[in-house]
Structure formats: C-alpha cells, structure tokens
C-alpha cells in the first residue's frame, strides 16, 4: 500500500482531522513501514509450528489496579467537534 498525498487527503477528510504539512511528511514515511510489513505476508509459514507463548506456563499475570481516569474527557478534548460524550463527524455513508 502506497501512502501518498492523495490517500492522506482522503483519510483526513474521512476522519475529520486536519494534518499539518510538516506532520504530513512524517506520515508519508509510514509508506516505507507498511511496505516492510507487507513483505512479512510473503513469508511461507505453513511448515512452522504455531506457538502461543514463549514463556512456560503462559504470560505472567498482573494485579489489576483501580484508577480514577478521565480518559473520555482527554480524548474528546482533542476532537475538532464534539457533542456531550460523542465525536461529531460529517456523514460519509449515504
């Protein structure tokens, strides 16, 4: 997948985000990363045994910690348009 100015412009419109030009150049570099990841799809893994975990006994568990978090407010503060606890975006499906 080639990430170019045209694709970025389309994604910018669909996501209702505004990407600055200097940030735009950085995002175009994602094309190289995506191309590398696409090469991974070319690997023949049919002869490889499926593994779930490299740690004996599974992944170590962690203790759940209760934290007071205002994640919703923090995320909505970044939105160009919001209404109550929702993002406001233009209709894209007719």
UniProtKB/Swiss-Prot annotation:
Its EC number is 6.3.5.-. Pfam families: GatC. Keywords: ATP-binding, Ligase, Nucleotide-binding, Protein biosynthesis. One of its GO terms (molecular function) is asparaginyl-tRNA synthase (glutamine-hydrolyzing) activity. It is an enzyme of class 6 (ligase). SUPFAM superfamilies: Glu-tRNAGln amidotransferase C subunit (SSF141000). It catalyses: L-glutamyl-tRNA(Gln) + L-glutamine + ATP + H2O = L-glutaminyl-tRNA(Gln) + L-glutamate + ADP + phosphate + H(+); L-aspartyl-tRNA(Asn) + L-glutamine + ATP + H2O = L-asparaginyl-tRNA(Asn) + L-glutamate + ADP + phosphate + 2 H(+). Coiled coil: none annotated. The keyword Zinc does not apply. GO terms for biological process: glutaminyl-tRNAGln biosynthesis via transamidation; regulation of translational fidelity; translation. Belongs to the GatC family. Heterotrimer of A, B and C subunits. Allows the formation of correctly charged Asn-tRNA(Asn) or Gln-tRNA(Gln) through the transamidation of misacylated Asp-tRNA(Asn) or Glu-tRNA(Gln) in organisms which lack either or both of asparaginyl-tRNA or glutaminyl-tRNA synthetases. The reaction takes place in the presence of glutamine and ATP through an activated phospho-Asp-tRNA(Asn) or phospho-Glu-tRNA(Gln). This is Aspartyl/glutamyl-tRNA(Asn/Gln) amidotransferase subunit C. It comes from Campylobacter jejuni subsp. jejuni serotype O:23/36 (strain 81-176). The gene is gatC.
């Amino acid at each position: 997948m080639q990430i170019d100015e045209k694709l970025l412009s389309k994604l910018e419109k669909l996501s209702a985000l505004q990407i600055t030009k200097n940030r735009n150049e950085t995002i175009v570099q994602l094309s190289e990363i995506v191309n590398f990841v696409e090469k991974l799809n070319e690997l023949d893994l049919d002869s490889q045994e499926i593994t779930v975990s490299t740690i004996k006994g599974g992944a170590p568990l962690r203790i759940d910690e209760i934290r007071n978090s205002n994640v919703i407010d923090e995320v909505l503060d970044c939105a160009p348009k919001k209404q109550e606890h929702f993002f406001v975006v233009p209709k894209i499906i007719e």
